[in-house]
Amino acid sequence: PFTNGEPFVLYNVKSSVTPLKGGAGNPVMRGNELVGLSASCDPPAQKVLAVTHTMISRFLEQARTGNYIGFPADGTQVTELTDPVFRKFLGLSETGGGFYVVKLPVYGSFYKAGVRPGDVVESVNGIPLDSKGLIKDPALGPVSANFLFRDSAKPGDTITLDIRRKGKDGSSQPMTLDVKLDRSAIEGDLVNPAPFISNPPYRIYGGLV
């Protein structure tokens, strides 16, 4: 199983061996193959959240080339569409899938491509979403749609979104948008979400800045 509330897909591992407290960075093996690295653990419950092999491979690839470009950052906040009353309000059918866009930064890649708050994303690159915003990956099984535009994509890649937008008459109109992924949701933020990546432009010495 996978978590669906994280920026990236994580393995949710149940282990018969009690994980070490604070055991981040421990290997997660399947057979004789490395499939992940632990990010956090819950020893009493014998559960571990682990970074996937996909992300590990991306970091290793960029380390070899010396060209770190990171992962796309869209900054989009979404919610699932399991409530039939909410679906009816949006002009959607009782069945079907997708996720509802709650809000997104105006400097992010999704907004620049035309996505707006209130839109419903029904598929990514032609892959349909269920009502919880999950896709059926042939190798990983049910996984968050984030996997398609965060985990497995690179800045500069283009994805295609099939969306629905509620019109003034209350009906839901289909649209197709192409999104060129980038990191503008981070780079355009006034508050640096990752201050540890670079040194601050000041020095504190003896109480003086």
Name each region found by the language model:
Residues 14-27, 79-123, 127-130:
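PDZ/PDZ-like domain segments forming the peptide/carboxylate-binding groove
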Residues 6-10, 23, 46, 71-73, ...:
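Extracytoplasmic
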Residues 58-100, 186-209:
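PDZ/PDZ-like peptide-tail recognition elements
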Residues 132-133, 153, 160-209:
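C-terminal, low-ordered peptide segments at domain boundaries
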Residues 53, 123-162:
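PDZ domains, with a preference for the canonical peptide-binding region formed by the helix
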Residues 24-32, 37, 48-52, 59, ...:
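Terminal peptide-recognition signature
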Residues 1-2, 33, 40-42, 54, ...:
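Solvent-exposed coil/turn segments that connect beta secondary-structure elements
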Residues 1-46, 50, 97, 102:
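Active-site region of chymotrypsin-like
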